[in-house]
C-alpha cells in the first residue's frame, strides 16, 4: 500500500532505452561532475550512535539520508519536506536509495598513475611515451628523476637520473638550467605536453622508411595507441589521476552483526588507506617537511591507490585483519565470482523448485508429474488471484490462510490454475538446449517429479537418484514461448544432427526387438491372416507364436487416401508393431518388417516424422513406448551364468599365443630383435589372440540351434540385449565370456602380459591387480574430462554467440564443394549425408539424362539426395555459413535446414549458440588421452588401394614404367587413379604414392574391392628411370655408409649415415649415378643427369657396377610412421584444432607450382627452392632441418599445396596457400574424425559456423587510400564499410588477407567489448576499450543479457526488427521536416507506415 502511495507522488520514470554503450577514460572534470562532495575523513560511522560521520566515507550530507525522507538529526521527517536540505545536519530529505547512486570523490594532494594503464600489458603509458615500463615505474615510485627539459645542458630528454646524478647535475649546471622531475607529476607533464598529431605524422613517415620487421611492429603498436587517443577524444594525461571517485556507500556496505561487531566491504578498508595517506601528505606539505619524507608519502599514496583499483597487480598484496587479500575494484569484475559472470550472466530464478525424478511410463509425451505440495507452492500467486476472483477470500491474508490449511477448494483451484499452464523442467548439467523442456504438469501424490521415459535421452537423465528443477513461466508471453518452442513434443529431432532424439531405449528396445524376431519351425508357421482380429485370436489360443513365419495382410492407404492392402511374409509380432504405424503411402510395412534394433527403430521414427508430421509422430512414439514396455515385461528376458558362453577354442588360441611369445623372448635373448621390437610383437600377438577369442565367442552365441522337435531354440539373452542396442556392447560380452585382454599401465603404456581369464572364470590375484590400474585411471580421467569439455563449450559459445540468422538470402555466388569422405576404401560419410538439408549453389543436373534434380538456391531434400546418389554425382557445390556475405550473422539460405525442425531455418535463430552446444555437448564422451599404443597395432598406414566402385580406370598425370619384373611402377609424384562409371562420370579419384606397384592401366575395368595399387608402407623407394650401370659417388665406408650384418639371416645391409658429423665428411655429397654403355652419365627424360642424391638412413639396394633397368629400386628410405607415433586424440585434438595451434612438427606446404631445386646447405638446414612454373612469380625458398626425412629429388615437379615435408599441416598455412575452402574442409574433416571415432554424429554446418567466427579478421596487405597500415588486423565488416566509403569517393580501396584466429583469441577480439570483458582477461579488455573509446552496439546475445535487455534472437529479434522500422520511420519524418516540406506531408506518410510495416522497410 505504502509503495503505491509513493508512486503517486513520484511516478516511475520509464527506463531510458539506448542503442549502444561507450566506454572511455574519465577526465578529472567528469569525476567531479559525478561527485556530490569531497570525502575528507577516513571515519565511517560513530561507534556510539551508529550514525555516519560527517565528511567520512558514509557521510549522509554527501550521499543522502539513511532512512527514507528523514534527515540525520531528525528535524525533518516525512514526505512533506521532500527536497529540503536540513540547515543543521546538511542532509537532503529524500529516498534512501540515492545512497546507491550518489558518488563522492577524493582530491589527491599529488597526482597518481592509474595502474590499469600502467601495468595492463602492453602498458599504454609506456608505449605512448616510448619508454620501457621499468623506467616509468622507476620514475613513478620515486627511484629516479626524469629530465623533461634539458635546456642547453649535455643531458638528454627523457634521461633517467638517480638521486646522486641529479645532485651532481644541479651542482654542475645550476638548478634553473634544466628541468628534471620525479613521480607522477613528471609523467603527467610529459603526457600533457604531447602533440599527438605531430607524433602520428612522424611515426607514419618513420614506418615508411624502416625496413626491419621488428621496428615496424613496434612503431605500429605505438601509432595505434596514438590514433586511438586522437579518435576517441581521450587525453593522455587523464591516465594520471588527480581525483579519485568514491563509489556510493550502499554498494560497499557496513553491516552491524550481532555482538557489536561490523562486517564491511573490503573497499572501505582500501578507501580508508587512500584517505589516510592523502591527508597525511597534505599535512606534510603544509608543514614543509623534508623532500625525502614527502616523496615517501607520495609513493605510499600511489601504492594505496594501486591497491584500490587492482590489489596485487604490483608489489605485495594488501591484506586485511584476517590475513586474506582485500578485494579491489578489479577483483569485483574478474573471474567466475566477478560481477560479469556471477551476477550479470548468472542470475538466479524465482518460482522454481527441485526434486528427485522417477519414471512416468503412463504419461503422454507432453506431460510430467508434478507433486501437489510443490505445485501449491509454485503457483501460489495464481491461486491467491483465483481465490479472490471466486470470492473465497477478500484479502491476501485470508487467501494465505486458506492455502496454508490446504482447504479442499484450494485443490480445485490448483487444478484450474495448472490446466494448460506449461512448466519448464531442467536437468543440470544443461549441455545443450534440450536440457530444458516444457511440459504440462499433471498433479501427483508423493514428492517426486515424474518424467516421461522417452525424453530421458535428451536430458541424459536416469532414475538412480537424479534431481531436476522446475521453473514456472509467469507472463503470458513466456507461457506462449514455452508451449510453442520448448514443449517436449516440439523437440523430436536432435539439433546437432537432425536424427530423432525421442527414441525408445533399453527395455523398450528389448521388448520391440523380441517382438520382431522371426524363428524357424515355430507353431503356426505358414498360416495366413486377413486382419488383426484373427491374429490376436490365434495368439490368445496359442495357435501361433509371436515369432512364427506367417503371411499377413497389411492395410494402409494410397496417395489419394483410398484404402489398399498388401500381403507380406512376416511374423505376428511385426504385425502388432505395424498396427501402430500411421496410415500413409510413404510409410510402408517394410519399415517395421525387420529386426527392430535401436537403429531401425530410430529410422522408423524418422520416416514417420518426415512423412506424417509432428502430431502423428508424437502419438506413434507414445504407443511404441507402451508396446515396448509391455512386451519386455511379457518376454521376461533375463540371463544366467550359462548364457555367457566361453568358446572351446579359447585354450588352444591362448596356448598358441603363449608359444609365439616364448619364441619372441628367445629371439630377444639371442640378440636378434631389440627390446622395443619384442615388446611390440608381444603386444600385437596378444591383441590378435583377444580378437580371435572374441570372434569365436560371438560365433557361438549367434549360432542358430534347433531342439529335438526341430523347433528353433530361443536366442541367447545376452546377444539379444547387445544386438538390439538395449544394453551392453560386444566389448563387454568379450570380457564376460572371452578374455579381458591387454591392460594399460597408469602411464598409458600397455602391459605385456594380458588378462587371460574372463569374468565368468574369475581373475587370478595378479590379473585382478593389473586390472585395477585401468579402472582407477578411468575414474580420474572422467573428472578431468568433464572440466575440460565444459571449458571448451564455454569458449565455443563465447566465440559464436553473436552469430544469428539475420537475413533470408545474401545472394552470394561462393560456396563449398562437398564430396563423400572415403577412408581406406570405406565410405565414412556419403555425399548424400553431407548435403542433405543444405542449399544448392549451382543447378544440379543428372550427368547422363541432363534432367534437373535441384535448382540453384533450392534446398536439397531427402528425395533429391536419393536422386543425386543414383545419378552417381561425385561432388556438389553448396552454400555455406562460411562463405555467407551478410555482414552481421548469417543468412538463412546459406545456413540451410534447421536440423531440430526439419524446415528451413527461421529468422532470428541463434545458430552460433546451437553450433557451440552441438560440438560441446558430446565433449564428455570423447577420450582425454593421447594414445601411446605399442607395436604394429598402430601402423595405420594403408599399403594398398582398392576400388570402392565398379567402373573403368583412367590415370591422371600418367607416369609409369615396367620394371625388370614386368610390374608397372608409378614414377610420378602426383599421379592419380580415377574410376569412371559406365557414363564416364568420375566416381572416385585417389593419389598414388611414388614407387607404388600398379596392377591396372588406362581403360581397364575394375570390380568393387579389387586391389589396383600397393606399396611398402615402411620405406620409400628411390628408383631409376633409365637403364645403365650403377656408380657410387662419395659413398665412403665408415664415413657416409655403414655396413651391418643381420645375425638371424646373415644378410649384410649398407645404410647411409650422417656424413656431416665427421670432419672428413663435411664436403661429401653421397649419390648414386647411372652411366650408359659409353661410360657417360645417362640423361633423364626431363633433362637432368641421372644422379640420385642419398639421404641419411637410406639403405642401398644395389652394388657398384650392377646393371639396372627402368623402375628398379636403387635405395630405400625408412619412413617415420613405421615407428609408433603418438596420436593426439579426443578432446585435446578438438581443442587444438579450434584454437588453431601450430602442431609441433608441422608439415611444410609448397606455396607455388614449380620444380624442386637444392640450394647451398646451411650447417643443419637444407635449402630447398621451388622454381616457379609460371613467369613473373618469385621463387620460394624453404629451410628444412637435416635430420628430417625428405623424399623429393632435385628436378621433381611439385604442385601448390603439396607437402614438401610430411607432418600435420598448420591450419594457417592451409589458409594462406590454398584458401578458405581448403581450410574449411581440413578443419571440418579433422574435427569430424575425432567425433566419428566415438560414434558421435554432428552436422558439418555447426563446425562451419564456428570456423566462420574464427575468420572474422583480415590482415591488411595493401592499404590503398585508407588510414590503415599494412599488417593491421581489422574486422572484415569494418574493412568492407571503409572500402564502400572509399569507392564512393573514387579512392583506392584497401585489400586484406583473411586471418585465422583460435576461438579464445577470436572471442577476445569481438567488436563488442562487453562480451570480451565477460569472457576472459577482463581488466585488459576494458583498458584497451577505454583507451580507444570503444562503442558497443549491443548486437550479440551476451551483451544484451548483461545490460538486461531481450536478446536479439528469436522473439527478441522480432522486437529489434520492429524497433528498427520505427527508428527508420522517425528519421524519415525528421528528414522531411528538415527539408521544410512541413509536417503536413509527413503525417499521412506516418499513417501509411503504421498500417503497412513493409513500407517502413
UniProtKB/Swiss-Prot annotation:
Record's subunit section: The RNAP catalytic core consists of 2 alpha, 1 beta, 1 beta' and 1 omega subunit. When a sigma factor is associated with the core the holoenzyme is formed, which can initiate transcription.
Name of the protein in question: DNA-directed RNA polymerase subunit beta'
Cofactor note: Binds 1 Mg(2+) ion per subunit. Binds 2 Zn(2+) ions per subunit.
A molecular function GO annotation: DNA binding
Catalysed reactions, semicolon-separated: RNA(n) + a ribonucleoside 5'-triphosphate = RNA(n+1) + diphosphate
Gene3D superfamilies named in the record: 1.10.132.30, 1.10.150.390, 1.10.1790.20, 1.10.40.90, 2.40.40.20, 2.40.50.100, RNA polymerase II, clamp domain, RNA polymerase Rpb1, domain 3
Positions contributing to Mg(2+) binding: 462, 464, 466
InterPro entries: DNA-dir_RpoC_beta_prime, DNA-dir_RpoC_beta_prime_bact, RNA_pol_asu, RNA_pol_N, RNA_pol_Rpb1_1, RNA_pol_Rpb1_3, RNA_pol_Rpb1_3_sf, RNA_pol_Rpb1_4
GO CC term, one of those recorded: DNA-directed RNA polymerase complex
Uppermost EC category: transferase
Any one GO biological process: DNA-templated transcription
Species this chain originates from: Rhizobium meliloti (strain 1021)
Stretch list, region Disordered: 1377-1401
Essential cofactor(s): Mg(2+); Zn(2+)
Positions that bind Zn(2+) 1: 71, 73, 86, 89
Residues reported to bind Zn(2+) 2: 810, 884, 891, 894
Organism superkingdom: Bacteria
Amino acid at each position: 500500500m505504502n509503495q503505491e502511495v509513493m508512486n503517486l507522488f513520484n511516478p516511475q520514470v520509464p527506463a531510458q532505452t539506448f542503442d549502444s554503450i561507450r566506454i572511455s577514460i574519465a577526465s578529472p572534470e567528469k569525476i567531479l561532475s559525478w561527485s556530490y562532495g569531497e570525502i575528507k575523513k577516513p571515519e565511517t560511522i560513530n561507534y556510539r550512535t551508529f550514525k555516519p560521520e560527517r565528511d567520512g566515507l558514509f557521510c549522509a550530507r554527501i550521499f543522502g539520508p539513511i532512512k527514507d525522507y528523514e534527515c540525520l538529526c531528525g528535524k525533518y521527517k516525512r514526505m512533506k519536506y521532500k527536497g529540503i536540505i536540513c540547515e543543521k545536519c546538511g542532509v537532503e530529505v529524500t529516498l534512501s536509495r540515492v545512497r546507491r547512486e550518489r558518488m563522492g570523490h577524493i582530491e589527491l594532494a599529488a597526482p597518481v598513475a592509474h595502474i590499469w594503464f600502467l601495468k595492463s600489458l602492453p602498458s599504454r603509458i609506456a608505449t605512448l611515451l616510448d619508454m620501457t615500463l621499468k623506467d616509468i615505474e622507476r620514475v613513478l615510485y620515486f627511484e629516479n628523476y626524469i629530465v623533461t627539459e634539458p635546456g642547453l645542458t649535455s643531458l638528454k630528454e627523457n634521461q633517467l637520473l638517480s638521486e646522486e646524478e641529479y645532485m651532481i647535475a644541479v651542482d654542475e649546471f645550476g638548478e634553473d638550467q634544466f628541468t628534471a622531475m620525479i613521480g607522477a607529476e613528471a609523467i603527467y607533464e610529459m603526457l600533457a605536453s604531447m602533440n599527438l598529431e605531430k607524433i602520428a605524422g612522424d611515426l607514419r613517415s618513420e614506418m615508411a622508411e624502416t625496413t626491419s620487421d621488428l621496428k615496424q611492429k613496434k612503431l605500429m603498436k605505438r601509432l595505434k595507441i596514438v590514433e586511438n587517443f586522437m579518435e576517441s577524444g581521450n587525453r593522455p594525461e587523464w591516465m594520471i589521476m588527480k581525483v579519485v571517485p568514491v563509489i556510493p556507500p550502499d554498494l560497499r556496505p557496513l553491516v552491524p552483526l550481532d555482538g557489536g561487531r561490523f562486517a564491511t566491504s573490503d573497499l572501505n578498508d582500501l578507501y580508508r588507506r587512500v584517505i589516510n595517506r592523502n591527508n597525511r601528505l597534505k599535512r606534510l606539505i603544509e608543514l614543509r617537511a623534508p623532500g625525502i619524507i614527502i616523496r615517501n608519502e607520495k609513493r605510499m599514496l600511489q601504492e594505496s591507490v594501486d591497491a584500490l583499483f587492482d590489489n596485487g597487480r604490483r608489489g605485495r598484496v594488501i591484506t586485511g585483519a584476517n590475513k586474506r587479500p582485500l578485494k579491489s575494484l578489479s577483483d569485483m569484475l574478474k573471474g567466475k565470482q566477478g560481477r560479469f559472470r556471477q551476477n550479470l550472466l548468472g542470475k538466479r530464478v524465482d518460482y522454481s523448485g527441485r526434486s528427485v525424478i522417477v519414471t512416468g511410463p503412463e504419461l503422454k509425451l507432453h506431460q510430467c508429474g508434478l507433486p501437489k505440495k510443490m505445485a501449491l507452492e509454485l503457483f501460489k500467486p495464481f491461486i491467491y488471484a483465483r481465490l479472490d476472483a471466486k470470492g473465497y477470500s477478500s484479502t491476501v491474508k485470508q487467501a494465505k490462510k486458506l492455502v496454508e490449511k490446504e482447504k479442499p477448494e484450494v485443490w480445485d483451484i490448483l487444478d484450474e490454475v495448472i490446466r494448460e499452464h506449461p512448466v519448464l523442467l531442467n536437468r543440470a548439467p544443461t549441455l545443450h538446449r534440450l536440457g530444458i523442456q516444457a511440459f504440462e504438469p499433471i498433479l501427483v501424490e508423493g514428492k517426486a517429479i515424474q518424467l516421461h521415459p522417452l525424453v530421458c535421452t535428451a536430458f541424459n537423465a536416469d532414475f538412480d537418484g537424479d534431481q531436476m528443477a522446475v521453473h514456472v513461466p509467469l507472463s503470458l508471453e513466456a507461457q506462449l514461448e514455452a508451449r510453442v518452442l520448448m514443449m517436449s513434443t516440439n523437440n523430436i529431432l536432435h539439433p546437432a544432427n537432425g536424427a530423432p532424439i525421442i527414441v525408445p531405449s533399453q527395455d523398450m528396445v528389448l521388448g520391440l526387438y523380441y517382438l520382431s524376431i522371426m524363428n524357424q519351425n515355430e507353431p503356426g508357421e505358414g498360416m495366413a491372416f486377413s486382419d488383426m482380429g484373427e491374429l490376436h485370436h490365434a495368439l490368445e489360443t496359442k495357435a501361433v507364436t509371436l515369432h512364427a513365419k506367417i503371411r499377413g495382410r497389411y492395410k494402409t492407404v494410397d496417395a489419394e487416401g483410398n484404402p489398399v492392402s498388401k500381403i507380406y511374409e512376416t511374423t505376428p509380432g511385426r504385425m502388432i508393431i505395424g498396427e501402430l504405424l500411421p496410415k500413409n503411402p510413404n510409410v510402408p510395412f517394410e519399415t517395421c518388417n525387420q529386426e527392430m534394433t535401436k537403429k531401425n527403430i530410430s529410422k522408423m521414427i524418422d520416416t514417420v516424422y518426415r512423412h506424417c508430421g509432428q502430431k502423428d509422430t508424437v502419438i506413434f512414439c507414445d504407443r511404441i513406448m507402451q508396446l515396448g514396455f509391455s512386451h519386455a515385461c511379457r518376454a521376461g528376458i533375463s540371463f544366467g551364468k550359462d548364457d555367457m558362453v566361453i568358446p572351446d577354442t579359447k585354450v588352444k588360441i591362448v596356448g598358441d599365443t603363449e608359444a609365439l611369445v616364448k619364441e619372441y623372448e628367445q629371439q630377444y635373448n639371442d640378440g636378434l630383435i631389440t627390446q622395443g621390437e619384442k615388446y611390440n610383437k608381444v603386444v600385437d600377438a596378444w591383441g590378435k589372440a583377444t580378437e580371435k577369442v572374441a570372434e569365436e565367442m560371438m560365433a557361438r552365441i549367434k549360432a542358430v540351434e534347433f531342439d529335438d522337435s526341430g523347433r528353433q531354440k530361443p536366442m541367447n539373452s545376452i546377444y539379444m540385449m547387445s544386438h538390439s542396442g538395449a544394453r551392453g556392447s560386444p566389448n563387454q560380452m568379450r570380457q564376460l565370456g572371452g578374455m579381458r585382454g591387454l591392460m594399460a599401465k597408469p602411464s598409458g603404456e600397455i602391459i605385456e602380459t594380458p588378462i587371460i581369464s574372463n569374468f565368468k572364470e574369475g581373475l587370478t590375484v595378479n590379473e585382478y591387480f593389473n586390472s585395477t590400474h585401468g579402472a582407477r585411471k578411468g575414474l580420474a580421467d572422467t573428472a578431468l574430462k568433464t572440466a575440460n569439455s565444459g571449458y571448451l563449450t564455454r569458449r565455443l559459445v563465447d566465440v559464436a554467440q553473436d552469430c544469428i540468422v539475420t537475413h533470408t538470402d545474401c545472394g552470394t555466388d561462393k560456396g563449398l564443394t562437398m564430396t563423400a569422405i572415403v577412408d581406406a576404401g570405406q565410405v565414412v560419410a556419403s555425399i548424400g549425408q553431407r548435403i542433405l538439408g543444405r542449399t544448392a549453389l549451382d543447378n544440379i543436373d543428372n550427368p547422363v539424362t541432363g534432367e534437373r534434380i535441384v535448382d540453384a538456391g533450392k534446398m536439397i531434400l531427402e528425395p533429391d539426395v536419393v536422386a543425386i546418389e543414383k545419378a552417381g554425382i561425385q561432388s556438389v557445390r553448396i552454400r555455406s555459413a562460411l562463405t555467407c556475405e551478410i555482414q552481421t550473422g548469417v543468412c538463412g539460405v546459406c545456413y540451410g535446414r534447421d536440423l531440430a525442425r526439419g524446415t528451413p531455418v527461421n529468422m532470428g535463430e541463434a545458430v552460433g549458440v546451437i553450433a557451440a552446444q552441438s560440438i560441446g555437448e558430446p565433449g564428455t564422451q570423447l577420450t582425454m588421452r593421447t594414445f601411446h599404443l605399442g607395436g604394429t597395432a598402430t601402423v595405420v598406414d594403408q599399403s594398398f588401394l582398392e576400388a570402392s566402385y565398379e567402373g573403368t580406370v583412367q590415370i591422371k598425370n600418367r607416369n609409369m614404367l615396367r620394371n625388370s619384373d614386368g610390374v608397372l611402377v608409378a614414377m610420378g609424384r602426383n599421379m592419380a587413379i580415377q574410376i569412371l562409371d559406365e557414363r564416364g562420370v568420375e566416381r572416385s579419384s585417389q593419389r598414388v604414392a611414388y614407387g607404388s606397384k600398379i596392377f591396372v592401366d588406362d581403360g581397364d575395368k575394375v570390380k568393387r574391392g579389387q586391389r589396383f595399387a600397393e606399396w611398402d608402407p615402411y620405406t620409400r623407394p628411390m628408383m631409376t628411370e633409365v637403364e645403365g650401370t650403377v656408380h657410387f659417388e662419395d659413398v665412403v665406408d665408415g664415413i657416409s655408409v655403414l655396413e651391418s650384418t643381420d645375425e638371424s639371416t646373415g644378410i649384410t645391409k649398407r645404410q647411409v649415415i650422417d656424413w656431416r658429423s665427421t670432419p672428413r665428411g663435411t664436403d661429401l655429397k653421397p649419390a648414386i649415378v647411372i652411366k650408359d654403355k659409353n661410360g657417360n652419365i645417362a640423361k633423364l627424360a626431363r633433362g637432368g643427369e641421372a644422379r640420385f642424391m642419398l639421404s641419411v638412413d637410406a639403405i642401398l639396394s644395389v652394388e657398384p657396377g650392377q646393371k639396372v633397368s627402368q623402375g628398379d629400386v636403387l635405395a630405400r628410405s625408412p619412413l617415420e610412421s613405421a615407428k609408433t607415433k603418438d596420436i593426439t586424440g579426443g578432446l585435446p585434438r578438438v581443442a587444438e584444432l579450434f584454437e588453431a595451434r601450430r602442431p609441433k612438427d608441422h608439415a611444410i606446404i609448397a606455396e607455388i607450382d614449380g620444380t624442386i631445386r637444392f640450394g647451398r646447405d646451411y650447417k643443419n638446414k637444407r635449402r630447398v627452392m621451388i622454381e616457379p612454373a609460371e613467369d613473373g612469380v618469385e621463387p620460394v625458398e624453404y629451410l628444412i632441418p637435416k635430420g628430417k626425412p625428405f623424399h623429393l629429388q632435385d628436378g621433381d615437379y611439385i604442385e601448390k599445396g603439396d607437402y614438401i615435408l610430411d607432418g600435420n599441416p598448420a591450419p594457417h598455412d592451409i589458409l594462406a596457400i590454398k584458401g578458405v575452402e581448403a581450410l574449411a574442409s581440413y578443419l571440418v574433416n579433422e574435427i569430424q574424425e575425432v567425433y566419428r571415432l566415438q560414434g558421435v554424429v554432428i552436422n558439418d554446418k555447426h563446425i562451419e559456423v564456428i570456423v566462420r567466427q574464427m575468420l572474422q579478421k583480415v590482415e591488411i596487405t595493401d592499404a590503398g587510400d585508407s588510414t590503415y597500415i599494412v599488417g593491421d588486423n581489422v574486422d572484415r565488416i569494418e574493412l568492407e564499410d571503409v572500402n564502400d566509403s572509399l569507392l564512393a569517393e573514387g579512392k583506392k580501396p584497401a585489400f586484406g588477407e583473411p586471418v585465422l584466429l583460435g576461438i579464445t583469441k577470436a572471442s577476445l577480439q569481438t567488436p563488442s567489448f562487453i562480451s570480451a570483458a565477460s569472457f576472459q582477461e577482463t581488466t585488459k579488455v576494458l583498458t584497451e576499450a577505454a583507451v580507444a573509446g570503444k562503442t558497443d552496439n549491443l548486437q550479440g546475445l551476451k551483451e544484451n543479457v548483461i545490460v538486461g535487455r531481450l536478446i536479439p534472437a528469436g522473439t527478441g529479434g522480432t522486437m529489434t526488427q520492429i524497433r528498427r522500422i520505427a527508428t527508420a520511420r522517425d528519421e524519415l519524418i525528421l528528414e522531411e521536416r528538415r527539408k521544410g516540406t512541413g509536417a503536413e506531408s509527413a503525417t499521412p506518410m506516418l499513417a501509411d507506415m503504421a498500417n503497412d510495416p513493409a513500407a517502413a522497410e
